[in-house]
Amino acid sequence: MKLKFDEYVLNKPLKDDERIVEHAQFIALYRNWFKEEHIEHFLEYWAWCHNNGIHARDRHASEGAHPLEKKDYALGMDKGYYGDEKIHSELQLTHEFNDFFKYMNNEIIRQYSFEYPDVGHPVAHEGKIQNTQPSEGYHVWHSEWNYEVPRRQLAYALFLNDVDEGGELEFLHQSIRIKPRKGDMVVWPAFWSHLHRGNPPLSGEKWIVTGWFEQLGVHNDITFEE
């Protein structure tokens, strides 16, 4: 297993129709897997929500978090819905981001599970669009799994813009920092082995889409499985 990303592969210019995946310590970086029209869809949805009275919430409002621990603004884009603590047998598909979740549950997860077969078939069905201003960020080391969210197996982050300075997705034990680059996605294990944080952007704001792949034990239209 590679311990570090290949810096040449990580930074080389790619043609419009070229896409690559680089792996290191169970962290996968998908370069150029999302195009301009995909990115604009999220930003247009954020603007539409804002113009129609649906506003993003900061961490203090949503979690009671102190801004020195974590601060950003997020707008949910959940696809699944829960009842009585259990996922319904069919996930709802009447949603703005159907194509995104189908792409995640086919192209993205299949490539990851090809590299790491024991991951199984987790499903991406929820996420959020997140905006981080200079000096803001997720400052504390954390994982994406705990007793309240035991189904989470992988986390993902899609960068919606370039950040010239700062704003890295940083992994503590792996000593890896990933620079935000528009159209790139990172997928990594949700567990304690991959403690991470989102560093403050220094040169301007940072936009991402982030969420999780969960072991739900269901087959549905999202994954094109019967």
What is the meaning of each model-derived region?
Residues 2-116:
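Non-heme Fe(II)/2-oxoglutarate
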Residues 118-133:
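Acidic, glycine-rich loop-and-strand cores that form catalytic or ligand-binding grooves
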Residues 129-149:
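Conserved short histidine dyad/triad with adjacent acidic residue
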Residues 140, 148-152, 163-226:
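Catalytic core of Fe(II)/2-oxoglutarate
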